[in-house]
Amino acid sequence: MKRICFLPVVLLLTGLLCGCTGQQQNDPLPQEHNHAMEEGTETPKYDHLTVYSPLPESETLLYCSAFRKDTGITVDCIHLPAGEMTAQLEQERDNPQASVLLGGSADNYIQLREAGLLEAYQSPELTDVPEAYQDEQGVWNPIYIGTLCFACNTDWFARTGTPMPTCWDDLLSPALAGQIVMATPKSSGTSYTTLATLVQMRGEDKAWEYLQKLDQNVGLYTRSGVEPAERVKNGEYAVGIVFSHDAFRAALDGYPIEVRSPADGTGYEIGACALVRNAPERERENARIFIDWLTSSRGEECYIEAKSCRLPANSTARAADGLPPLDEVKLITYDLEWAGENRTRLISYFDTHIYSARTLS
């Protein structure tokens, strides 16, 4: 785990993108809170907050620094891939060390919600978020939208004359043997969304058959869902299966990356944040203030400064220039609840029959 403490010296499409005792573990705890996102709000007496996040450190540094400037609250952000973040919360169930989870796909939050690891809290800022992106049970809070895509290294495709992939089956081309990089769903929320997308598109039997074939072309499974875009932009691999914001970020930075959305349909994530159940009492108020800030237009417009290329969930937040509208992407009807409820089972099958089998071969 990497820990960064933000000290006193010194977050897309508009209209889309923790603790109490004495209750049952699977019964989320509703809380009332009416913190106003206004200047002059009195800083709580305890000015510290601990957060777990799978987002890149460069992003969380900016978000947490801006939050401290606005509120006077210092954030200690611990970086973990989504799967490892889940495992960490399980280990700390009786004594959580963090109060807020920042980022990662909502299907992961659904799994955590069902495991009784999250505290129910809904920011008042959600009045500006489309209902379709909100948690029906009122536990996690949506903050951005991201679609799955192929990040393609244009230099490699120009050099080899290989056609760029336009659909999922194109990734099975022999010309791409060893040239695909993706994360393992055991640790990465990005890769689990890929897995759940293929299962929902094709059915389980055909999805597993496809993934067995795809495995023959995968040169590397990474720990983090962000890393494949980094590997592709540096020319180590030809194609990365990533969320669009990670690919667009590299392209807008001038790297030889072209973003291809599968023409036969693709899944997406609703990026979320939430309170950790049974989190340190002294951080409870600060945690709610942070959730309110993250879901506000002020918080989500920090995506522009961070060059994260994330699509804000808050309809009043401005999105970065140059990002294609979601209506240009063929999205499947992605079932978040199903994905969350089946997460453990699908990851276990992938790990046993594809990833581990590969490592042992």
Regions found by a protein language model. Name each.
Residues 276-334:
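Mature extracytoplasmic/periplasmic domains
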Residues 1-48, 359-361:
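Short, low-complexity disordered leader/linker segments with a strong preference
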Residues 50-61, 96-236:
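Extracytoplasmic ligand-binding site segments that recognize negatively charged/polar headgroups
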Residues 22, 29-111:
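Early extracytoplasmic/lumenal segment of secretory-pathway proteins
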Residues 151-156, 196, 270-283, 302-305:
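A bilobed periplasmic-binding-protein/Venus flytrap-type ligand-binding module shared by bacterial periplasmic
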Residues 332-361:
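Conserved C-terminal helix/tail region of periplasmic/extracytoplasmic solute-binding proteins
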Residues 107-111, 233, 238-256:
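A ligand-binding cleft/hinge motif common to bilobed small-molecule-binding domains
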Residues 146, 210-215, 221-222, 253-277:
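Periplasmic-binding protein-like
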